[in-house]
Protein backbone atom coordinates (compact mmCIF):
# COMPACT_ATOMS: atom_id res chain seq x y z
CA UNK A 1 0.00 0.00 0.00
CA UNK A 2 1.25 3.47 -0.87
CA UNK A 3 2.27 5.69 2.06
CA UNK A 4 0.05 8.72 2.55
CA UNK A 5 1.68 12.14 2.29
CA UNK A 6 0.80 12.90 5.93
CA UNK A 7 2.40 9.62 7.06
CA UNK A 8 5.55 10.43 5.08
CA UNK A 9 5.63 13.92 6.60
CA UNK A 10 5.22 12.62 10.16
CA UNK A 11 7.93 10.01 9.60
CA UNK A 12 10.44 12.63 8.47
CA UNK A 13 9.44 15.11 11.17
CA UNK A 14 10.19 12.37 13.71
CA UNK A 15 13.49 11.69 11.95
CA UNK A 16 14.31 15.42 12.28
CA UNK A 17 13.33 15.43 15.97
CA UNK A 18 15.59 12.41 16.61
CA UNK A 19 18.40 14.17 14.74
CA UNK A 20 18.02 17.22 17.02
CA UNK A 21 17.90 15.04 20.15
CA UNK A 22 21.23 13.52 19.09
CA UNK A 23 22.60 17.08 19.01
CA UNK A 24 21.38 17.49 22.63
CA UNK A 25 18.38 19.67 21.76
CA UNK A 26 15.36 19.30 24.03
CA UNK A 27 12.16 18.80 22.04
CA UNK A 28 9.42 20.98 23.53
CA UNK A 29 6.63 20.33 21.02
CA UNK A 30 6.01 18.70 17.68
CA UNK A 31 3.30 19.70 15.20
CA UNK A 32 2.27 22.82 17.11
CA UNK A 33 -0.84 24.26 15.47
CA UNK A 34 -2.31 27.70 15.99
CA UNK A 35 -5.29 28.02 13.70
CA UNK A 36 -5.80 29.94 11.52
CA UNK A 37 -2.28 31.41 11.81
CA UNK A 38 -0.13 28.37 11.03
CA UNK A 39 1.84 25.44 12.37
CA UNK A 40 5.39 24.66 13.42
CA UNK A 41 6.87 21.22 12.85
CA UNK A 42 9.24 21.23 15.84
CA UNK A 43 9.81 23.59 18.76
CA UNK A 44 13.05 22.78 20.55
CA UNK A 45 15.52 24.22 23.01
CA UNK A 46 19.21 24.55 22.11
CA UNK A 47 20.98 25.62 25.29
CA UNK A 48 19.23 28.93 26.10
CA UNK A 49 17.62 29.45 22.69
CA UNK A 50 14.12 28.42 21.61
CA UNK A 51 14.33 27.03 18.08
CA UNK A 52 11.39 26.86 15.68
CA UNK A 53 12.10 24.24 13.03
CA UNK A 54 10.50 23.75 9.62
CA UNK A 55 11.11 20.25 8.23
CA UNK A 56 11.13 19.69 4.48
CA UNK A 57 11.45 16.34 2.72
CA UNK A 58 11.87 15.57 -0.97
CA UNK A 59 12.50 12.22 -2.65
CA UNK A 60 15.04 13.75 -5.02
CA UNK A 61 16.84 17.03 -5.65
CA UNK A 62 15.71 17.08 -9.29
CA UNK A 63 13.87 20.36 -8.76
CA UNK A 64 16.03 21.76 -5.95
CA UNK A 65 16.86 20.95 -2.35
CA UNK A 66 14.02 20.49 0.13
CA UNK A 67 15.08 23.71 1.91
CA UNK A 68 14.43 25.65 -1.30
CA UNK A 69 10.75 24.73 -0.94
CA UNK A 70 10.42 26.72 2.29
CA UNK A 71 8.78 29.67 0.56
CA UNK A 72 8.68 33.27 1.81
CA UNK A 73 4.97 32.73 2.49
CA UNK A 74 5.73 29.64 4.62
CA UNK A 75 8.48 31.51 6.47
CA UNK A 76 6.06 34.31 7.27
CA UNK A 77 3.46 31.84 8.63
CA UNK A 78 6.07 30.09 10.78
CA UNK A 79 7.30 33.43 12.14
CA UNK A 80 3.77 34.66 12.94
CA UNK A 81 2.93 31.38 14.66
CA UNK A 82 6.21 31.43 16.60
CA UNK A 83 5.69 35.01 17.78
CA UNK A 84 2.21 34.06 19.02
CA UNK A 85 3.73 31.04 20.81
CA UNK A 86 6.38 33.25 22.43
CA UNK A 87 3.79 35.75 23.62
CA UNK A 88 1.33 33.10 24.85
CA UNK A 89 4.05 31.28 26.80
CA UNK A 90 5.76 34.47 28.04
CA UNK A 91 9.11 33.35 26.64
CA UNK A 92 12.02 35.69 27.33
CA UNK A 93 14.74 33.56 25.71
CA UNK A 94 16.38 34.20 22.35
CA UNK A 95 14.60 32.58 19.43
CA UNK A 96 15.86 31.15 16.15
CA UNK A 97 14.33 29.76 12.96
CA UNK A 98 15.96 26.66 11.48
CA UNK A 99 15.19 24.39 8.56
CA UNK A 100 15.90 20.68 8.44
CA UNK A 101 16.11 19.44 4.88
CA UNK A 102 15.79 15.70 4.27
CA UNK A 103 16.46 14.06 0.91
CA UNK A 104 17.05 10.33 0.57
CA UNK A 105 19.38 9.48 3.49
CA UNK A 106 20.84 12.98 3.79
CA UNK A 107 19.86 15.43 6.54
CA UNK A 108 20.92 19.07 6.35
CA UNK A 109 20.38 21.36 9.36
CA UNK A 110 20.31 25.03 8.44
CA UNK A 111 20.53 27.24 11.52
CA UNK A 112 19.14 30.78 11.28
CA UNK A 113 17.53 29.87 7.95
CA UNK A 114 15.30 32.94 8.13
CA UNK A 115 14.56 35.74 10.58
CA UNK A 116 11.58 37.92 11.56
CA UNK A 117 13.49 41.12 10.83
CA UNK A 118 13.00 40.45 7.11
CA UNK A 119 9.21 40.71 7.40
CA UNK A 120 6.74 43.46 8.18
CA UNK A 121 3.49 42.36 9.80
List each model region and its residues.
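Active-site metal-binding core of divalent-cation-utilizing nuclease and nuclease-like domains
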Residues: 23-50
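Acidic-basic catalytic patches of nuclease active cores, encompassing PD-(D/E)XK
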Residues: 1-30
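Domain-level recognition of nuclease-like catalytic cores that cleave nucleotide substrates
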Residues: 88-121
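Acidic active-site catalytic centers that drive phospho-/nucleotidyl reactions
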Residues: 13, 39-41, 54, 74, ...
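Mg2+/Mn2+-dependent nuclease catalytic core
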Residues: 59-79, 84
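Short, glycine/acidic-enriched loop or turn micro-motifs at the edges of active sites
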Residues: 32-34, 57, 101
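Conserved catalytic cores of phosphodiester-cleaving nucleases, focusing on short active-site segments
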Residues: 40-61, 78
